[in-house]
Amino acid sequence: MQHEVNIIVAVSEALKFRKQKPLARHEEILEHINSLIRQQRDENTKLGMIVATNRALDFLDKNPEMNDKTALQHVMANLPEILASASGE
């Protein structure tokens, strides 16, 4: 459960940063949340944070009419798949 919470926190922070700097590239946004990622000891959580953030950003890029809440819901709905891909299953 804590893995999921940490992933959602990272995605939320990334979306907040994107709202402040709408022209920021994905790399800049990931760099912004890098401190959150580095705080984690579990490699799967770190990878999950990166994958989930990229999924949320890609979702918003492909669906510009959607808002951050919808992107976060999209990530949450796909969290089992994200965690599985992060753990290499």
Language-model segments: which ranges?
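Intrinsic-disorder/low-complexity detector
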Residues: M1-E89
